[in-house]
Amino acid sequence: MSVVRDAGRITAAGLLLAVVAALVVVVLGVEHDVRAWYGLHPSSPSRVSATHVFANNIRTCAIALLGAVNLRLWPRARWLLDPILAALLAINVLLVGAALGAYGTPLLRLVAAHALLELMAAAAAGAAYLHARRREPLSLAALAWCAVATVGLLLLAAVLEVHGA
């Protein structure tokens, strides 16, 4: 199934971008500056609800899922959606990667599980978009799989982020 293959490729690309961002921070020796910019304290994470975390993440993924549906009706929308979706994924994973480079193992312990689930959720939504972009018939089953996977992964990620893994 090409949707599963695409989701795997998007996940791999996201992981690669995050690693590159982390390496850039470490190689340039700007960990302190990046930590000052983020202002995070891994020893005392912020207190937000799982609903808040889920709502923030689902908005981003919804753009890809709705984009997949929209492309069936208006194929030229890809000229607008392609750069938006690419930028959303790239910016999010680069920010996470830079933070991991700056904070190292303490932050990695806090975010590893839920960040990977969030990336996989974005990849599932992105896979639906890529499927529609190639003008392959986006079956209702494939779209439903992507939507259910996205929502399920984001729910699990939100619970892990708030209550710890």
List each language-model region with its residue ranges:
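N-terminal signal-anchor transmembrane alpha helix
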Residues: 2-33
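Alpha-helical transmembrane segments of multipass membrane proteins
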Residues: 17-21, 60, 64, 153-157, ...
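Membrane-interface interhelical connector segments
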Residues: 30-47, 94-103, 107
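Interfacial helix-start motif at the membrane-water boundary
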Residues: 44-67
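Small-polar-interrupted transmembrane alpha-helices in polytopic inner-membrane proteins
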Residues: 64, 75-102
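Interfacial helix-loop-helix junctions of multi-pass membrane proteins
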Residues: 98-116, 158-165
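Alpha-helical transmembrane segments of helical membrane proteins, especially in multi-pass transport
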Residues: 110-132
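Terminal transmembrane helical module of multi-pass membrane proteins
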Residues: 125-165
